[in-house]
Amino acid sequence: MATIRKMVLSDVQAVMDVEKASFPEPWGEETFVKEVEENPYAHYYVIETDGRVCGYCGLWLIIDEAHVTNIAIHPDERGNKYGEQLFRHACQQAVENGAIQLSLEVRVSNTAAQHMYRKFGLVPGGIRKNYYSDNGEDALVMWVGLK
């Protein structure tokens, strides 16, 4: 059984493990510390299985817009619908905090993530050219109105 809760400072190392296993250029530990401790717009959540963090999602909530900063599930735990559970929770939290729309960027090559986002009603809104610094890949910008 997976549980989702707000991320706390003591989760940073476990989140870093997920981050390093998921992205070619992972965020640094200090970035997550600042997000959790200092950024008033940041809302981060972790998903746990058997008491172990296996994924996380971050949002910035600014006025009435939510922007997904990052979402990742450890590769060993993918295929269990944890990403969908976590994303659903993040969207619900965005609505509860007054967001009326949500946006994110996703690699144009990440069709699995795009498919999941489409399940939640997100639609393409544009392309950010050369967005990803590791290989210059474009990002697909996706949006959805929240209810």
Where are the model-predicted features located?
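Acetyl-CoA-dependent GNAT
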Residues: 2, 6-76, 87-89, 93, ...
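Conserved hydrophobic beta-strand within the GNAT/NAT acetyltransferase core sheet
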Residues: 68, 102-106
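Active-site acidic-Proline motif in GNAT/NAT acetyltransferases
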Residues: 74-76, 80, 108-110
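Acyl-donor (CoA/ACP) binding surface of acyl/acetyltransferases
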Residues: 77-80, 84, 129-131, 138-140, ...
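Conserved acetyl-CoA-binding loop-helix of GNAT-fold acetyltransferases
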Residues: 79-92, 115-119
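Short glycine/proline-centered loop/turn elements that form peptide/ligand docking sites
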Residues: 87, 109-113, 130-135
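Conserved catalytic-core motifs of GNAT/GCN5-like acyltransferases
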Residues: 105, 118, 123-140
